[in-house]
């Protein structure tokens, strides 16, 4: 069975690059009838954050990336790691190193002075003497001393590393007994049955060490896919200076999970010229072998465009549910569905939609200064006052359009003579959906009241 995993460290909030990695793993597993596992790599007890762990789970729930089985926590598996360290020691594949920090620092200085790559010199690899007093040893793996390590990567193809350039007898357990990152990753991936590892290419340099450990422990190597990083539009690695990076911040900014996942799947992968991908489409077409080798570029305008698409196309009930979190209960409004459907056509985010809705639902507490100065004049106020007099019944948008056109014709006016001033009176702004839909939503009594308010404001 194909098994993938996502394995974040809870030392910070989930980054959108991490969510893309999770999505790729999720899609590959689900499309092939496999399992998608979640592992929290929380062995750094000083830097771990319970808030960060919860944020990861919240992001998964928001995006509906359901994982199989229970979450695996590395901090609860130290005894398992100790067993495998002991196994390597017993088999002579690892050894205790008593080199002090001072000795390591001195060795590094000497190597740098000779312009050599700093690395451990294997002095305790075959040590049989009496250990020095007062030093708790670290445990090092016996790595190959020469040759090449070949990685057959599903994205990058064959990647070769010269042992002399990349490896030394690296540490697998610290002097306090805690295991190192590469060791825990290998043990857990093997015991969890992970067959395919899709991760960022910042992990590529770890892979030779992990391959050494897979082989030493007698575990089958998984297939690796190393995904190029996401860059900002300036070509530099994506960071906070390019905008939001925390996944849940996108929710707070009014982005839909469908839009964010669609956006992320396309950062490095494509299917023809298609831009819109539902989860069902992704499951049908996604293959990690098709991921681009080169870095992708974050494009905020593309995300806005996708979000606007999903706002326009989501079913009313679902969009109304989403909008409740932004303080607007469209179902509780007499003309809620009409208002939502009118606003969705011009909204890029749910925050924007919420602001537009509140501007219509609530009578203006203030008026946009520029719009007021431009459109609220003695003549426009006179027109508004006359228009209010014809409002006797609640009509639909077509009905309001009919009586408005009759009013304009009878008074020798054009729509522009009324519409913008009416928008300002009703919403406080010169920007709104169709003025006739706004009239239907508000009803004649509320329209007249808001016109009266602006007439009083001007006196």
From Swiss-Prot:
Keyword hit for Cytoplasm: yes
Keywords: Aminoacyl-tRNA synthetase, ATP-binding, Cytoplasm, Ligase, Nucleotide-binding, Protein biosynthesis
Motif ('KMSKS' region): 237-241
Catalysed reaction, written as an equation: tRNA(Glu) + L-glutamate + ATP = L-glutamyl-tRNA(Glu) + AMP + diphosphate
Signal peptide: none
GO biological process, one term: glutamyl-tRNA aminoacylation
Localisation: Cytoplasm
Entry coiled-coil feature ranges: none
Residues that hold ATP according to the record: 240
UniProt keyword Protein biosynthesis present: yes
Gene Ontology CC terms, in alphabetical order: cytosol
Purpose: Catalyzes the attachment of glutamate to tRNA(Glu) in a two-step reaction: glutamate is first activated by ATP to form Glu-AMP and then transferred to the acceptor end of tRNA(Glu).
Entry's family note: Belongs to the class-I aminoacyl-tRNA synthetase family. Glutamate--tRNA ligase type 1 subfamily.
NCBIfam families reported for this sequence: gltX_bact (TIGR00464)
Subunit structure: Monomer.
Protein name: Glutamate--tRNA ligase 2
Species of origin: Campylobacter curvus (strain 525.92)
Record lineage: Bacteria, Pseudomonadati, Campylobacterota, Epsilonproteobacteria, Campylobacterales
């Amino acid at each position: 069975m194909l098994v993938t995993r996502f394995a974040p460290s809870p030392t910070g909030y989930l980054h959108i690059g991490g969510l893309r990695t999770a999505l790729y793993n999720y899609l590959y597993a689900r499309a092939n009838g496999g399992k998608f596992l979640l592992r929290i790599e929380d062995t750094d007890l000083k830097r771990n954050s319970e808030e960060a762990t919860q944020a990861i789970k919240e992001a998964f729930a928001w995006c509906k990336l359901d994982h199989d089985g229970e979450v695996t926590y590395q901090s609860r598996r130290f005894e398992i790691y100790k067993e495998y360290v002991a196994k390597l020691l017993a088999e002579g594949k690892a050894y205790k190193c008593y080199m002090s920090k001072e000795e390591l620092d001195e060795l590094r200085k000497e190597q740098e002075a000779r312009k050599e790559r700093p690395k451990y010199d294997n002095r305790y690899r075959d040590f049989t003497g009496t250990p020095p007093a007062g030093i708790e040893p670290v445990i090092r793996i016996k790595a190959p001393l020469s040759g090449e390590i070949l990685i057959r990567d599903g994205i990058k193809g064959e990647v070769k590393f010269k042992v002399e350039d990349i490896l030394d007898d690296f540490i697998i357990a610290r002097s306090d007994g805690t295991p190192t990152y590469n060791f825990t990753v290998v043990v857990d991936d093997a015991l969890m049955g992970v067959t395919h590892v899709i991760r960022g290419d910042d992990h590529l340099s770890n892979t030779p060490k992990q391959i050494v450990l897979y082989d030493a422990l007698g575990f089958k190597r998984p297939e690796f896919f190393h995904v190029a990083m996401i860059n900002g539009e300036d070509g530099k690695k994506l960071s906070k200076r390019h905008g939001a990076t925390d996944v849940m911040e996108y929710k707070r900014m009014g982005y839909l999970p469908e839009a964010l996942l669609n956006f992320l799947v396309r950062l490095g992968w494509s299917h023809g010229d298609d831009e819109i991908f539902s989860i069902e489409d992704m499951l049908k077409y996604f293959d990690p072998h098709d991921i681009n080798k080169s870095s992708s570029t974050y494009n905020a305008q593309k995300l806005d465009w996708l979000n606007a698409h999903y706002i326009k196309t989501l079913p009313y009930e679902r969009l109304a549910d989403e909008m409740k979190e932004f303080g607007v209960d469209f179902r509780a409004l007499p003309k809620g569905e009409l208002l939502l459907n009118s606003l969705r056509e011009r909204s890029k985010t749910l925050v924007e939609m919420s602001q537009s809705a509140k501007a219509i639902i609530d009578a203006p507490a203030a008026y946009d200064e520029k719009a007021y100065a431009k459109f609220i004049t003695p003549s426009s106020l006179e027109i508004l006052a006359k228009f209010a007099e014809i409002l006797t019944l609640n009509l639909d948008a077509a009905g309001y359009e009919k009586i408005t056109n009759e009013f304009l014709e009878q008074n020798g006016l054009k729509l522009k003579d009324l519409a913008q001033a009416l928008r300002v009176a009703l919403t406080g702004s010169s920007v709104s959906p169709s003025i006739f839909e706004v009239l239907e939503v508000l009803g004649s009594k509320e329209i007249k009241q808001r016109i009266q308010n602006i007439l009083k404001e001007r006196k």
